[in-house]
Amino acid sequence: MVTGIQLNKLKVLFFAEGATLAHVARPLMLAKELNPAQFDVTLCRPEAFSKLTTGLPFRILDLECQEAKIFAQKLAHGSPLYDFATLSGYVDADLALIDQTKPDVIVGDFRLSLSVSARLRSTPYIAICDAYWSPERPLNPPLPVLKFTRYAPIPLVEYIFRRIAPFAVRLHALPVERLRKKFGLPSLGQDRRRCTWTSSGR
């Protein structure tokens, strides 16, 4: 007797970039919430966060990532967080994992290279991102904690930051733009917000 129809599980591949704990925790929490009867989940995370992913009911794979301390140093100086060479290496690592798991959909948290990697494999891509980076709203990001902010009055620093923010956004987008050009993908308009938010839709 036929008791039901066996449906294929949706294969979801999560990329948890190792920049900060938050970038690992968010994909991890989402992966845990997916019903294992409906979803075939794989979570890729840097080996440094292995203690967070023991004893889970889905597959865990190591992910090549820039060291968190390097990310923190660049963030403190207001420098672009990833250079072209790093992102190019990320694409190679991404493609190897995508080819290994053959997902139906990819979910990434601050894995900027997925703007390219997912496109090269024609796989739907969902980007996890803070809402204030949405290009659908006016550019008004919160003042980051930079190395020099402790030495100047916050109102003055905020005033300066608001005026240079559009230029800083373009500067931070340059490595991703160069990466997309290398692989023949269209420009995101030198807008860093689109590198983290709407790259999932392009």
Short names for language-model regions:
Residues 9, 18, 36-37, 41-85:
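Conserved nucleotide-sugar phosphate-binding/catalytic loop shared by glycosyltransferases and other
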Residues 11-13:
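Residues that mark the start of a beta-strand
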Residues 16-28:
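A short, glycine/small-residue-rich beta-strand->loop->alpha-helix junction that serves as a flexible
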Residues 33, 52, 116-117:
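Hydrophobic/aromatic ligand-binding patch that stacks against planar heteroaromatic rings
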Residues 40-45, 105-108, 187, 201-202:
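Short, hydrophobic beta-strand segments that form beta-sheet elements in well-ordered domains
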Residues 74-113, 163-192:
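Conserved nucleotide-sugar donor-binding subdomain of glycosyltransferases
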Residues 89-153:
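Conserved nucleotide-sugar donor-interacting segment of glycosyltransferase catalytic cores
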Residues 126-202:
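Active-site-proximal region of nucleotide-activated glycan assembly enzymes
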